[in-house]
Amino acid sequence: VQCANRNFVALLKQITPSLVLIDGLYGMEGKGPIKGSPVFHGFAVASEDAVAADALATHVMGFNPDDVPYLELAFHAGLGNNRWQNVIGIDPQTVKFPYRPHPLFQRQRKYRERLRPAGPVPQAPASPPLHEGNPEAKD
C-alpha cells in the first residue's frame, strides 16, 4: 500500500499532465483493477489538476478523498489540490454512486492516518475549473 501511493506521487512529479480526462462511463469496484466487478456509472471528469480530478472521482465513487494517501501526499508535495472547486457541469452529488471498496481499503486508511500531520490541516488553494458530467446529459 505504501509503495503504490508513493509511486503514484513520484510518477506525477516526473510527468505533469496539462489535461486530465477520467472516463467514468464504467468503473470497477471490489478487487479492481483486475479482478473487480464492472459498474456502469456514466460520468466523466476533465481538469488541468490531476490531483483535484482524482479527488472528485473518488468522491463521486462514494469514498472520502481524505482516505486516499496518494492524494494527501501529492497535495503536500505541491502537485495539485486534493479538493475540488469550480465544478462546471452537473452537480457531482447527482452522479455520486457508492462503490464497494477493495479488500485492502482499510489498510490504506490506516496508512493515511499515519501520514496525517499533527495540527490544523492546511487549506488547499483554489483549483482551475473541473469539468464533470454525464455523457448522456444535455447542456
Roles of regions detected by a PLM:
Residues 1-139:
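Extended, low-polarity segments enriched in aliphatic/aromatic residues
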